[in-house]
UniProtKB/Swiss-Prot annotation:
Pfam families: tRNA_edit (PF04073). One of its GO terms (molecular function) is aminoacyl-tRNA deacylase activity. Disulfide bonds: none annotated. This is Putative Cys-tRNA(Pro)/Cys-tRNA(Cys) deacylase YjdI. One of its GO terms (biological process) is translation. InterPro entries: Prolyl-tRNA_editing_YbaK/EbsC, YbaK/aa-tRNA-synt-asso_dom_sf, YbaK/aa-tRNA-synth-assoc-dom. Its EC number is 4.2.-.-. The keyword Hydrolase does not apply. Keywords: Lyase, Protein biosynthesis. The gene is yjdI.
Length: 159
């Protein structure tokens, strides 16, 4: 009998919002993994798998960006959509304290606070995207519009 995965905060929140989703799991030793290897482990094309990045403008002014795993956040475009002059990625050591999530398991859903969130516009035309479910080894497959609704996100050109 297969072992049932424990629900994360991200899963609980989307269930409360009656959002359709699928949990995808993969074997892990608990160490952080990169998004490209996650796509390979779950057997999906890179175009569907997105990573969650957290950036800051000054002190305690955080933004969340959801971008394809094979792409990089364009910080100039990101600053423009946020209305900030400059944003920078937060240090890895700050991630847990700011979001409540570890590197490799950071979900745009269910962070400690609801930060302004932007999903790359490339996701809008897809039937589904895959993001972290809030822990290493667990991903969520859901419609991009449902992801946006779940974390009050906007779509924007950010890569």
């Amino acid at each position: 009998m297969a072992k049932k995965m424990a629900k994360t905060n991200a899963v609980r929140l989307i269930e409360q919002q009656n959002i359709s989703y699928e949990v995808l799991g993969y074997k892990t030793d608990g160490q952080p993994v990169d998004g490209i290897s996650v796509a390979e482990k779950i057997g999906y094309s890179l175009k569907y798998v997105y990573k969650t990045l957290v950036a800051a403008a000054g002190t305690n002014h955080y933004y969340v960006f959801v971008v394809p795993v094979a792409e990089e956040l364009d910080v100039k475009k990101a600053a423009k959509v946020t209305g900030e002059k400059k944003i920078e990625m937060i240090a890895m050591k700050e991630l847990l304290a700011v979001t409540g999530y570890l590197r490799g398991g950071c979900s745009p859903i269910g962070m400690k606070k609801l930060f302004p969130t932007y999903i790359d516009a490339s996701a809008e035309t897809l039937d589904f995207i895959i993001v972290s479910a809030g822990k290493i080894g667990m991903q969520l497959k859901l419609a991009p519009q449902d992801l946006a609704r779940s974390c009050d996100a906007a779509f924007a050109e950010i890569v």
